[in-house]
C-alpha cells in the first residue's frame, strides 16, 4: 500500500513540475489514444460480433419482394439467391432474357418463392422501358432493393483516351439506372414505412481513382446520394446504405482468384445481409449511410481512415493503374500477333 502511495506522489510531483504546455500535450495524447482505442473496438465489434438489422423487418417470409438489378451474374446473382433463401420473392432485372429465366428457375426450385424477371439494357434504356419497369413494380410489396448493376472501364485509361460511348454507358448504368429504379420503388416503401436500399459502391468512390475517373466519379455519386437519401427517408423506417466494396471475384472486376482481400460473391453477400444498419469499417470515415461489412474490406477501410492521407492512396492507385494498363496493352498485342 505504501509503495502505491509513493508511486502516486512521484507521478503527482512530476506533473506539477512540468510546464503547462507539457501537461496539455500529455492530456491531448491521452485523449487521442483513448479515441483510437474506442474507435477500434467499435469497428471490431460491428464487423465481427454485433448482428445487423434482421431482414424480417423488411418483409422476409411475409410475402415481400426483393428487387435486384444486374441479377444474373456475380454479386447480383448471389444477392438474388440469398434473398430468396431468406424468404423474399425476387424480381430479377438484367439484360439477357435467357439467363434471367434460368436464374429465376433456380431460385424457385431451391427456395420455393415467387420470382419475376424484367429484361432491360440500362446503357440504352428508353423512357418506354423505364415506364414498363414501373408498371411491373406496381402492386409489388418491395421490401428490399439492391442497386447492383454496374459498369467500369474496359481498362484503366486517362480521360482524354477514354471512348465517349464507354463514358456514357458508365454514367447511364451506374448513376441514371440507380436513380430511376430507386425513384420507381421508393414511394411504396414510404407508404409501407419500411424498406432497405443497398447501393453497391466501391472504394473508388471514397478514394479518387486516376485512370478510372468516370467510374470513380459515379461511385462517389452513390456515396453522396446514399447519404442524402438515407437522411430523407430515415423517418419512414427505410435504411439506405452505400455498400463500400473493394475487389470481389466477378466479371466486372476481371478477377478470377479469391484471396483475403478478394472474396467470392457468396461470403461477400452474406456479410452485407448480416450487417444491415452497421457501418463496420466505415464507422468513423465521415461518410454517413456507408457500410463496409466484409471483414477484410472493413479493416482496410478503417486503416485508411486512421492514416488519413488521401493523396497517398491516390498516388498509389494511379501507379497501380498505370501498371494494369501496361499489362493489358501487352496482352492485346500478344493476342493480335497470335491471330
Swiss-Prot record:
Task: Give the binding site residues for NADP(+).
Answer: 67, 96, 121, 148, 215, 219, 248, 250
Query: Which molecular function terms from Gene Ontology are attached?
Result: ketoreductase activity; very-long-chain 3-oxoacyl-CoA reductase activity
Q: Which GO terms describe its cellular component?
A: endoplasmic reticulum membrane
**Any transmembrane segments, and where?**
21-41
Instruction: Please state where this protein is localized.
Output: Endoplasmic reticulum membrane
Q: Which GO terms describe its biological process?
A: fatty acid elongation
Active site as annotated:
215 (proton acceptor), 219 (lowers pka of active site tyr)
- From the UniProt record, list the reaction(s) this protein catalyses: a very-long-chain (3R)-3-hydroxyacyl-CoA + NADP(+) = a very-long-chain 3-oxoacyl-CoA + NADPH + H(+)
- The organism's place on the tree of life at top rank: Eukaryota
Q: Which UniProt keywords apply?
A: Endoplasmic reticulum, Fatty acid biosynthesis, Fatty acid metabolism, Lipid biosynthesis, Lipid metabolism, Membrane, NADP, Oxidoreductase, Transmembrane, Transmembrane helix
Q: What does this protein do?
A: Component of the microsomal membrane bound fatty acid elongation system, which produces the 26-carbon very long-chain fatty acids (VLCFA) from palmitate. Catalyzes the reduction of the 3-ketoacyl-CoA intermediate that is formed in each cycle of fatty acid elongation. VLCFAs serve as precursors for ceramide and sphingolipids.
Identification of the protein by name? Very-long-chain 3-oxoacyl-CoA reductase
What is the scientific name of the source organism?
Answer: Coprinopsis cinerea (strain Okayama-7 / 130 / ATCC MYA-4618 / FGSC 9003)
